[in-house]
Amino acid sequence: MLGIIGGTGLTKLPGLSVTHRQVIRTPYGEPAGPLTFGELDGHPVAFLARHGYGHTIPPHLVNYRANIWALQSQGVSHVVSVGTVGGIHPQLGPGKFCVPDQIIDYTHGRESTFAKYDGKPVVHEDFTWPYCQEMRLRCIAALHRAQEDFFDGGVYAAVQGPRLETKAEIDRLARDGADMVGMTGMPEAYLAREISLCYATVAVSVNWAAGRGDSAEAITAEMIEATLANVVDRLYSVLKHLACMDYDQELPVTPGGICDV
């Protein structure tokens, strides 16, 4: 089953025919809210609002472990994480979709592993490619089917938040190779890897990062909300195309290729 994690601007899923909501108790505390189960265009999905259904949980206080564990415990095998980002790359202006393929983690102090380190041998999980390639290709196929012009690949810089960045910080991220900046990409992606969820991100650029675009323009909540209002219907179309895919069978994936979904 497909799990959808909604970020800023997606605290509910338009068009979802809800069957039930369920509060999941986890060994890691409470998730951001109950899981919402239903059908999207006739296909089963589970939806979770990352920041809570009232958008009350800031990125550095999200219980990422509980969120990811809750989805997996209910039979979710594949996860698309929807997140807003600031565009650093010149092609990632407001309103542009992106399917990143790399992450640089600048966060700190977040619970970032399910491991207990209770005397058992330490396991070092490979994270060379932080996103599930199969799920990335599904996202790419869905964006093509929705006739979206999108950015394929790119480096997601995961920062602590909740404040936005300074121009100097964005300049540093750009020198490090980042194409976009967001606050929720880690440890979410790694936790999904630890428990074998096939996870990828569809990022939505809602503003130019500080100093990009019109560098004199301040980043305001109104600016971000206006962009979100313009992309919600487009995002819903992408998610419908994702929901209609078969998640009971693992797809053969060729690096750099589009699988038949």
Language-model segments: which ranges?
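Generic hydrophobic/aromatic pocket-lining and core-packing "Φ" positions
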Residues: 68, 170, 186-189
